[in-house]
Structure formats: structure tokens, C-alpha cells
Swiss-Prot record:
Species: Salmonella arizonae (strain ATCC BAA-731 / CDC346-86 / RSK2980)
TM region positions: none
Protein name: 3-deoxy-manno-octulosonate cytidylyltransferase
Any one of the GO BP annotations: CMP-keto-3-deoxy-D-manno-octulosonic acid biosynthetic process
Function as written in the Swiss-Prot or TrEMBL entry: Activates KDO (a required 8-carbon sugar) for incorporation into bacterial lipopolysaccharide in Gram-negative bacteria.
Alphabetical list of InterPro entries matching this protein: Cytidylyl_trans, KdsB, Nucleotide-diphossugar_trans
EC number: 2.7.7.38
Lineage: Bacteria, Pseudomonadati, Pseudomonadota, Gammaproteobacteria, Enterobacterales
Length: 248
């Protein structure tokens, strides 16, 4: 099947300035992400960035770049600018791969595209089972609850679903009911155009989760369990050192 990968790569980062260009074993991080995307079989891969230095690094690795504005409030807004500049038709399948995921398995990039293509829905994503209490109660690990057909009911930084009987006895174990949302999305290009026309929703502003805008406006998000779990993403200096060691 045919799909396009867009990799948002914002240069500024509060905790890690110039994050896309941070060296991981001899290559900028964004180049590692580009290589994972190439392994997925995508028809076209575009790095969306607001900085010329990132553009030069990607082009030196043979990649395609779209320079975007620096004032976007979310990765989806950056994608929308690329969709318009490239003139993608409304039915084009777009996969959003985060620019700070150098260890993302190529198989799940393709998986989210295939899941979207098989359904009459505007957006798809992935999740993975949570097995540790530390992760279940970590607000940085976003949880998702699904309906019987695999569509998202809600995303939250809180521990959902709350296992009342289990947690009343102990918070040391979590059972097998929690799913962690993985930050990879598939969309049809027309859906991205609709998304950015909607006003931000109260729920997304409370949780700081942009996917909640989709549910607020009554649209569906399909969620599949990932065929492989991504390695460490890079949000902090400690993450960077961990990834360097794991990829060595």
C-alpha cells in the first residue's frame, strides 16, 4: 500500500536545545529517525522543520525537507502546513513519526498506515500493554481506553481504567487492563485539514493531549496493539545517554 511519512522536527526544545541535531553514535538524531522511516516502505518521507541546520542535515543524508513556520502549537499543525504545501489529495495516508524517536521500529510505522487504510476513519494510532505500576501511575505515560471494536473512548495522563478493587488493596501491581498510548499517528490528509479548522477543546487543554480534540468533536480514532514496542524516546539528557548506549 502507498503512504507518506512526515517527521516533524522542531529545533527549539526547553530541555534539549537543538534536539534533532543531537549526535547519536556519529549521526544526528533526525537522520536515525529518517532511516527507520525508510525501512517502513513509505512511498515518500518528508522532514518538516523550522530550522535550516536541520534541513541541511537531512538533505546531506539524502532526505526531503519542507521548511515550516516556527510558531506552530502542535505537531499536527506542522503536518497541516506540509499537506497544503505538497498538495496531497484528501485520501492520501499520512503517518506522523516523531522526530525524537530514533529507535522506533519500522514495522509499526507500516502497521499504523495499514490499520488506517483498512477502515473508514480519519485517524489511527497504536498502544502497548502496561505491566508496571511505575508506568501506570506516571503522568508522562499517556493511557488510552478502548471500546469493543478498538476505537478510543478516552486518552489521559491519569491511570485509566481505575481498577477499584485491585488498587484499594495495593498500588504495587496493575494487572493487564492498562494500555499506554504510543505517539505515532496515521491520518488521511483531508482529516488533517479538518482537524486544524477546529478550535482547541477544553479537554485537550486540561490534559495537554491534542488527540482529545478529535474525540471532543465526535470523530473516531482506531487504536491497535503495536506489533513491536518502540525503544526509548529522547525527551531529556538522561534519555539521550540511554539511547546512545542502546544503539551502540
Amino acid at each position: 500500500m502507498s503512504f507518506v511519512v512526515i517527521i516533524p522536527a522542531r529545533f527549539s526544545s526547553t530541555r534539549l536545545p537543538g534536539k534533532p541535531l543531537l549526535d547519536i553514535n556519529g549521526k544526528p538524531m533526525i537522520v536515525h529517525v529518517l532511516e527507520r522511516a525508510r525501512e517502513s516502505g513509505a512511498e515518500r518521507i518528508i522532514v518538516a522543520t523550522d530550522h535550516e541546520d536541520v534541513a541541511r542535515a537531512v538533505e546531506a543524508a539524502g532526505g526531503e525537507v519542507c521548511i515550516t513556520r516556527a510558531d506552530h502549537q502542535s505537531g499536527t499543525e506542522r503536518l497541516a502546513e506540509v499537506v497544503e504545501k505538497c498538495g496531497f489529495s484528501d485520501d492520501t495516508v499520512i503517518v506522523n513519526v516523531q522526530g525524537d524517536e530514533p529507535m522506533i521500529p519500522a514495522v509499526i510505522i507500516r502497521q499504523v498506515a495499514e490499520n488506517l487504510a483498512q477502515r473508514q476513519v480519519g485517524m489511527a494510532t497504536l498502544a502497548a500493554p502496561i505491566h508496571s505500576a511505575e508506568e501506570a501511575f506516571n503522568p508522562n505515560a499517556v493511557k488510552v481506553v478502548l471500546d469493543a471494536e478498538g476505537y478510543a473512548l478516552y486518552f489521559s495522563r491519569a491511570t485509566i481504567p481505575w481498577d477499584r478493587d485491585r488498587f484499594a488493596k495495593s498500588l504495587e501491581t496493575v494487572g493487564d487492563t492498562c494500555l499506554r498510548h504510543l505517539g505515532i499517528y496515521g491520518y488521511r490528509a483531508g482529516f488533517i485539514r479538518r482537524y486544524v479548522s477546529w478550535q482547541p477543546s477544553p479537554l485537550e487543554q486540561i490534559e495537554m493531549l491534542e488527540q482529545l480534540r478529535v474525540l471532543w468533536y465526535g470523530e473516531k480514532i482506531h487504536v491497535a496493539v503495536a506489533k513491536a514496542v518502540p525503544g526509548t524516546g529522547v525527551d531529556t539528557a538522561d534519555d539521550l545517554e540511554r539511547v546512545r548506549a542502546e544503539m551502540r
